[in-house]
């Protein structure tokens, strides 16, 4: 009987051998060289070959800019040479939907044209709806190894993580127990250049696939608008808020209406350990983000309320 460790040995040694003939010959050769002393019969070779087959990791890609967005298509093209990719994304832009999901309308799921060889589906729902639909309808036989969101047209640094549909995908994936990463570029242009991000995206994806992420932790990755980057900063979320958010206008018919506008105002512009600082100074910002939002510092202090109320 072939021992389990032989399967691992064969798997490592045959990673570059792709044809059936090569695999069969190598299986027999390894059986002899590792002390089994004879070639295996066809049934045993088939058993070993099945163990040797290395499946590509399966990655779900979504976003909040829509399945047609250049950022999503660029991300898929960065992955398909080493991963099986499935896309399920909104049929139009759904920026700012955060963790929203649909309860008052039926959802549609439509097959679209492949991107870089990856199958693409779109939905009329939110980014989170797309994740839920993908798990309900697209992964019946095999679960994804990783969930990715982006690449977003515009950054999602600092408090934007709470509003972001891009990170809504990531948080939903994390809630389901899957390693999840969001990618964003600080360039809202629909024709933004995503090529400088390629080596960093691929490296981060490979690291997460190999090492995993802690339970209930996902990653928020933001890139500055640049052709080259100074490096990577693993940092914390910047504190701040949006100001002057509502732009008031008057309709020709005489009533007022509003556009959401404004800008982000940092509460700690000089702090050098934040994503906001990293982006302003030309670094890729990686923020490990927790799902558990409990404030443990306050938990014990407020325990007294249990007796006082």
Predicted regions and their residues:
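Electrostatically charged, flexible surface regions
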Residues: 195-309
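Conserved acidic residues
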Residues: 145-146
């Amino acid at each position: 009987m072939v021992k389990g460790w032989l399967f691992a040995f064969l798997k490592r040694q045959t990673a570059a051998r792709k044809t059936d003939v090569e695999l069969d010959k190598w299986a027999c050769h390894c059986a002899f060289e590792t002390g089994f002393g004879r070639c295996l019969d066809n049934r045993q070779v088939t058993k070993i070959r099945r163990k040797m087959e290395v499946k590509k990791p399966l990655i779900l890609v979504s976003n909040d800019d829509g399945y047609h967005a250049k950022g999503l298509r660029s991300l898929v093209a960065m992955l398909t040479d080493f991963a099986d990719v499935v896309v399920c994304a909104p049929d139009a832009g759904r920026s700012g939907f955060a963790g929203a999901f649909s309860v008052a309308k039926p959802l549609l799921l439509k097959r679209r044209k492949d991107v870089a060889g990856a199958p693409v589906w779109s939905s009329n729902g939110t980014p989170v709806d797309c994740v839920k639909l993908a798990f309900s309808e697209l992964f019946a036989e095999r679960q994804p190894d990783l969930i990715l969101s982006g690449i977003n047209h515009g950054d999602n640094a600092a408090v934007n993580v709470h509003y972001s549909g891009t990170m809504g995908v990531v948080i939903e994936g994390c809630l389901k127990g899957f390693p999840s990463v969001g990618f964003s570029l600080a360039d809202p242009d629909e024709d933004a250049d995503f090529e400088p991000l390629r080596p960093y995206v691929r490296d981060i994806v490979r690291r997460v696939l190999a090492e995993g992420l802690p339970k209930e932790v996902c990653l928020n990755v933001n890139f500055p608008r640049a052709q080259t980057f100074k490096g990577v900063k693993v940092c914390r979320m910047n504190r701040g808020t949006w100001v002057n958010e509502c732009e008031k206008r008057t309709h020709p018919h005489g009533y007022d209406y509003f556009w959401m506008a404004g800008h982000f105002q940092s509460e700690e512009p000089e702090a050098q350990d934040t994503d906001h600082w990293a982006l302003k100074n030309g670094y890729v910002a990686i923020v490990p983000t927790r799902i558990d939002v409990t404030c443990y510092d306050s938990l014990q202090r407020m325990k007294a309320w249990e007796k006082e109320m």
